From Swiss-Prot:
Spans annotated as Coil 2A: 268-286
Region (Linker 2): 287-294
Ranges for region Coil 1B: 151-251
Protein name (database record): Desmin
Length: 469
């Protein structure tokens, strides 16, 4: 690990632990820490003291560095110029000594606070080390497990699930075959149903034709009955006419007999009348016999036609009844087949839904197990990363502890130095050659303290510390 990385790691870890306030400025040497000045006040007071630290580093000649050192020691906003060999006033030296003592006192207080914070920091480091040990034990325990056994268990469960999926696939294939067979039976039954429907339509057409024939025969029978009635009426009329003619002839005969009796001289017409009567009776008997024969023949023909039509109608009715029975039986069979088909389709859908739900459940179990495996792997990787991070933090903390130990040792050695009092300051002149050779680096730290109360600035003080490197 390089020195730059150690420095940046120390600073970042310190800032994470103690925050940005306080501490050591970047770029300052280990032997010269700079502590912030904090104002002191009572708890609950509305006044506050703000400390600002300004750090300036520059390279100058010997005379310029000495002038800057003078300004830093005096702590004033301006640097008075003195000639060579000129001595400072004792009051100014006492003020400088008093300021130095105050600074040392404040540094002791701040160092005590820093020691307390450092003790808290050490306690936190111990706590982190305990957590690190616990996590290391957890990681070792996790490493000590048998991951192959878990993998074997998961593989066994996956094989069992795959076997169940194959069984369900075979069952589904068998159900598909049964469904295809049922569909074939359904198609065959549908074809048979179509044939039966066609036969039913043909029977209905034949029945309609028979009904037309029956209607025609009924109309013919009614026509014949009407004709028979008309013939009967005609026969009755002819009989009545014949009787009227006979009565007229008899009346004529009686009149002729009376005339014959009255006129004895006229020829005898009785024989002629008897002949005429005989002729008319013969003609009437002949007409009556012919009418009866014609009526009987027509009645017999109509009776035969009616019997024939009645036989056809009876046969048609019988066939219609048979067709109706067949249609009813076929309808019942079709309804039964439809019920069977519906039940089979319902069973098939239920089986498909059950198999689909079971397959989805198995897929969910597989996905869940894979997710658990992935989660365990991620958790193991996370524990390893946390362990590595804790190791890095531990190394950084060890480095910071060593650094703070060096800083504390340097601060203790600096505090134990005797306090120098300056009663007089001697200045010496340097030649340009010496000025050119006395080039060094001076570090200037400006501490500006602003006291505010209720948002208003009450007092403001500026302090400077110079250090020549």
């Amino acid at each position: 690990m390089s020195q730059a990385y150690s420095s940046s790691q120390r600073v970042s870890s310190y800032r994470r632990t103690f925050g940005g306030a306080g501490g050591f400025p970047l770029g300052s040497p280990l032997g010269s820490p700079v502590f912030p000045r904090a104002g002191f006040g009572t708890k609950g007071s509305s006044s506050s003291v703000t400390s600002r630290v300004y750090q300036v580093s520059r390279t100058s000649g010997g005379a310029g560095g000495l002038g800057a050192l003078r300004a830093g020691r005096l702590g004033t906003g301006r640097a008075p110029s003195y000639s060579a060999g000129e001595l400072l006033d004792f009051s100014l030296a006492d003020a400088v000594n008093q300021e130095f003592l105050t600074t040392r006192t404040n540094e002791k207080v701040e160092l005590q606070e820093l020691n307390d914070r450092f003790a808290n920091y050490i306690e936190k480091v111990r706590f982190l080390e305990q957590q690190n040990a616990a996590l290391a034990a957890e990681v070792n325990r996790l490493k000590g497990r048998e991951p192959t056994r878990v993998a074997e268990i998961y593989e066994e469960e996956l094989r069992e699930l795959r076997r169940q999926v194959e069984v369900l696939t075979n069952q589904r294939a068998r159900v598909d075959v049964e469904r295809d067979n049922l569909l074939d039976d359904l198609q065959r039954l549908k074809a048979k149903l179509q044939e039966e429907i066609q036969l039913k339509e043909e029977a209905e057409n034949n029945l309609a034709a028979f009904r037309a024939d029956v209607d025609a025969a009924t109309l013919a029978r009614i026509d014949l009955e009407r004709r028979i009635e008309s013939l009967n009426e005609e026969i009755a009329f002819l009989k009545k006419v014949h009787e009227e003619e006979i009565r007229e002839l008899q009346a004529q005969l009686q009149e002729q007999q009376v005339q014959v009796e009255m006129d004895m001289s006229k020829p005898d017409l009785t024989a002629a009348l008897r002949d005429i009567r005989a002729q008319y009776e013969t003609i009437a008997a002949k007409n009556i016999s012919e009418a009866e024969e014609w009526y009987k023949s027509k009645v017999s023909d109509l009776t035969q036609a009616a019997n024939k039509n009645n036989d056809a109608l009876r046969q048609a009715k019988q066939e219609m009844m048979e067709y109706r029975h067949q249609i009813q039986s076929y309808t019942c069979e079709i309804d039964a087949l439809k019920g069977t088909n519906d039940s089979l389709m319902r069973q098939m859908r239920e089986m498909e839904d059950r198999f689909a739900s079971e397959a989805s459940g198995y897929q969910d179990n597989i996905a869940r197990l894979e997710e658990e495996i992935r989660h365990l792997k991620d958790e193991m990787a996370r524990h390893l990363r946390e362990y590595q991070d804790l190791l890095n933090v531990k190394m950084a903390l060890d480095v910071e502890i060593a650094t703070y130990r060096k800083l504390l040792e340097g601060e203790e050695s600096r505090i134990n130095l005797p306090i120098q009092t300056y009663s007089a300051l001697n200045f010496r002149e340097t030649s340009p050659e010496q000025r050119g050779s006395e080039v060094h680096t001076k570090k200037t730290v400006m501490i500006k303290t602003i006291e505010t109360r209720d948002g208003e600035v009450v007092s403001e003080a500026t302090q400077q510390q110079h250090e020549v490197l």
